[in-house]
């Protein structure tokens, strides 16, 4: 099965290439914190030889509570992203929530992310696709993996085949998500790169009444399970003080654990991709 390669700057992303990392923080809490977090990611990924893209949100439009922190907004967010790119020379990924945001965000960011909750919104999908930017498509918690082909077709019909799929867990009753490992193989059949968002797969949506809970202690186990499927890469959020993060702290890896965490995953990824495929159908 041929696997497509997506290029982001100098980075080549594909299911049969060494894993890449979309990593950063959940939301831009401040300029200084964004620079601090990105600096550590750049140091660790450079040491380990992992292709790296910085990620963060400028606006968390789907928070549980109307009083929850959302971020600096588009204008200030783009200024921070521009500074991150200038300081560290890395590509940047961020999510957009409304069609009008797609074009201005694409002027700054290298990858636009289609949020899971909004992944069937055709007007948003088409607006993002028409920017010609690479699009990271989050699989909605309520969609089966095979249904992702319809979102891919929408993007292709709008003229964009620079696409990445991203698993982030499936609703399992109330306030819980699970990851179906068989889903990775189904999505890889579409030939586009597949990533695993281990951070949000650890969520317990609404688990803290007015915000999401999480299971940070299981991040290594779940990440290893995902990477064992031979994926294009991992989507990860880390924070120097997760217990006081302004969004999704219960799911975030502690920043000081980033190097040992990624070192193990890079070794596992290399091992898995050494194995020749076995036809069992």
Curated annotation (Swiss-Prot):
Any one GO molecular-function label of the UniProt entry: 3-deoxy-8-phosphooctulonate synthase activity
Protein's pathway: Carbohydrate biosynthesis; 3-deoxy-D-manno-octulosonate biosynthesis; 3-deoxy-D-manno-octulosonate from D-ribulose 5-phosphate: step 2/3; Bacterial outer membrane biogenesis; lipopolysaccharide biosynthesis
Record key words, sorted: Cytoplasm, Lipopolysaccharide biosynthesis, Transferase
Main localization category: cytoplasm
Superkingdom of the organism of origin: Bacteria
Keyword hit for Lipoprotein: no
Pfam family, one: DAHP_synth_1
Reactions accelerated catalytically: D-arabinose 5-phosphate + phosphoenolpyruvate + H2O = 3-deoxy-alpha-D-manno-2-octulosonate-8-phosphate + phosphate
GO cellular component, one term: cytoplasm
Top EC group: transferase
GO biological process, one term: keto-3-deoxy-D-manno-octulosonic acid biosynthetic process
The protein's Enzyme Commission number: 2.5.1.55
Subcellular location: Cytoplasm
Keyword Coiled coil: no
Family note: Belongs to the KdsA family.
Record's protein name: 2-dehydro-3-deoxyphosphooctonate aldolase
Source organism (scientific name): Azotobacter vinelandii (strain DJ / ATCC BAA-1303)
Gene: kdsA
